[in-house]
Amino acid sequence: MTNPVIIALDFPNWQKTDQFLQQFPKDEALFVKIGMELFYQEGPQLIKTLKARDYRIFLDLKLYDIPNTVQSAMTVIGQLGVDYTTIHAAGGQTMLQAGAAGLKAGAKQANVKPAKLLAITQLTSTNEAQMQQEQLVSVSLPESVAHYAQLAQQSDCDGVICSAQEITTIKSKTATDFLCVTPGIRPATSQNNDQKRAVTPLEAAQMHSNGIVVGRPITQASDPYQAYQAIKSEWESFK
């Protein structure tokens, strides 16, 4: 699963999460994303439970604090043995490097493979007008994203979370193997909801995304497994 379809488990508790997962074959090698709500409700035991099912895990907590605090928190995350985790690029180079160091230290302590550290650039719910007016950023949205991506690469991160439209620019300014993981994925028949820079699975593949994160089009589907298979098929159709 080099370029995965990652299911965002945006549920309030383990009971609802497990009810959803029971709709998938037990041998389906899922890659799932755990966000703040579910992790804060269930804690690290949730990660252990999912790993026992041989799921790959993206722990999306978007750390953003002073460098020492981020390093300590990332050490704990590193011990969990997750596959991906996130940090805010806006925290700056010292914070990003501290997070990367903590993640590797925690993995070493637990004798597990270090997670890929992905930096948040601009949220896919943010448009250019909002960014310029509310963040007082004078450059364009693509320029801001590219700047954060370069900063992340220079600060020991493995990649970024970004909209698919930004991938070409990011890879041209970083490296072809710098990971670009794409949220805001919506099949053509789906509503965009609060994702303002959404694309289809095929479009993301054509733009060379290294992985897509899909939530409601799967979790709120009448048949989640069928919806997952359809999205996965579309995603993998572009070679």
From Swiss-Prot:
A GO BP entry: 'de novo' UMP biosynthetic process
Active site as annotated: K62
Record's GO cellular component terms: cytosol
Keyword field: Decarboxylase, Lyase, Pyrimidine biosynthesis
EC number: 4.1.1.23
Catalyzed reaction equations: orotidine 5'-phosphate + H(+) = UMP + CO2
Binding sites annotated in the UniProt record for substrate: 10, 33, 60-69, 124, 186, 195, 215-216
GO molecular function: orotidine-5'-phosphate decarboxylase activity
Pathway: Pyrimidine metabolism; UMP biosynthesis via de novo pathway; UMP from orotate: step 2/2
Domain of life from the UniProt record: Bacteria
Leading EC class: lyase
Function comment: Catalyzes the decarboxylation of orotidine 5'-monophosphate (OMP) to uridine 5'-monophosphate (UMP).
HAMAP family cross-referenced by the UniProt entry: OMPdecase_type1_B
Family that this chain belongs to: Belongs to the OMP decarboxylase family. Type 1 subfamily.
Protein name: Orotidine 5'-phosphate decarboxylase
Organism encoding this protein: Latilactobacillus sakei subsp. sakei (strain 23K)
